Amino acid sequence: MAWKIPAPDAVHWPAAPSWSGWWRALMLSCSAVVMAGCGIYFWLHDSRALVYAFAGVVVLILLFAGIAGWWMYRYGVLLEHADGTTQYNAMLEAQWQRWAQEGMVVSGVSTLFPEQVRTPQDSGEPVSTLAPLRLPECPGSTYLFTELLAPLRVALQIFIRNQSLTVCLPESASEDDWQCFWSVWAALSLPLSAIQLSEMKPEPFSRQMTLWQQKDAVRTGWLIIRHNWTPGSEGTQGAVAWLLSHPDIRTGLRPCATLHRVFPTDNTLPDGDLRQFLQYQCVSNTMKGVWSDAVTQPHISRLMVALSQQHKAVAEQGEATVIPPVSPVQQYLPHWLGEMKDGETWFAVTQVIQMAEHTRETQVLALAKGSEAFLMSVSSGGDNVA
């Protein structure tokens, strides 16, 4: 699973030259040559012995200087190569970090949940129940779309002034549902010419996010509507609407949050995945809240340990960083949304978006109870790189 990011090139730092042994060898060699020359001179009384001894010492010194120069040159080349490799690895890491922190800007969120579902803006404790929370019987698609679009009416009017908008209804939407959407859209005095229709395909959430982040999706915004409000639906019922756009689009709206690139993993949250997630999605290092479900909750402690190690490593490198004064607040999704089944991922991400917008702080979601397992950072505002 995880991101397919290539490993950095190996860096081989050369050992610094050690001259102590060579220096002793030079001194011993020179001393031996001088003593030999002096001995021959006193034995044979031949002054040429002193000349030869002096020449031998000079040759030894020049030989030592040549070897030392070659060693210093080789050491400098290897040191420069290691430093260049380090800088190249740092450049690649920065590029992958920018890639990992790309995301979609959330310009508006509308929700429809049972009264027991507490939003971050509400006071009081979460519901603390594992039972599914139910809505009254749905009066119809017209009521559903009206309740979701009415709070977003002003944001939609501003958004579609200069940008087109692609509307994505659930894959189960019928022709009658589309007709109801058209009628509600027109009733809110929104121009029909500004929107494009797109049926929401049954893609996993991470795959859907990847499709929205592709370059050909930059030309349009996205109105996403998902709900779990049918007679046969299981788990907590509700409905959500998101107004998404690519960071390159100027919408004229104040961003609520940024959904950063999804990190695919498995249910056990392997340590290697946690380290890679924190290393490349750097905005997660400033998290003030971490959300988990029944599957990932037992593994959150290892995420906290990995986060602490990441902060320690950055501090040892002497790099500037924003270290939270306290550990991130742990949020348990069933305490907010009850027992979830259908629409679990969309409802969970919606809660995290609302918390990031309310606290103006980064939140991290670890979700694995649904059809896929992933980690994702949700930062406040529209800054998609920490």
Question: Model-flagged regions — what are they?
Answer:
Residues 237:
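Phosphate-binding/switch region of NTP-binding enzymes
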